[in-house]
Amino acid sequence: MKTDLLIFLALSLPAFTQTTVKDALAKHWKTSGEFTIAVANAMPADGYTFRPNPEEMNYGQLMAHIAGVNLNACSNASGLAKPALPPKIAEWSKDTQKVDVDKDTAVAFLRDSFDFCDKAVAAMTPERLDAVVGPPNRHLTGFEWLWAYFTHTAHHRGQAEVYLRVKGLKPPGYAF
């Protein structure tokens, strides 16, 4: 009897662990989305063309970049098809350094990208989290796609906070 129970627990543990990982990913992607949108909203509309130096993306391009990469990463991780790009974003994606993205478009695109990522994470199975997925030139598990691009979002959100401070604006407080 004890042996059967131990075998059952040993075989069940990976499933419990994966569920916990998935739940943590879902929680933190949601928080990251809300925080990133708050940072996006902190810049006034007329600041969306601001760039601290000529080599940097402007604020609107930076927000669109975060959202576009979210769609790619969450699609690769989950296998869900990416939603169609809004017309202004499709135009921007053809020339990311020359086409500006206004605040309303950028914030809506960010919101849509995080909504898509919420659905993608919810659709993940333990097998998909462990499987190598996505394009052949990127050997990442589903978990790695989500984690790598969670940190990508954090990196660029931090960059956006510097843009705000350079403009004399106070970014929203950290959320975790």
What kind of feature is each model-predicted range?
Residues 1-8:
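Sec-dependent signal peptide recognition
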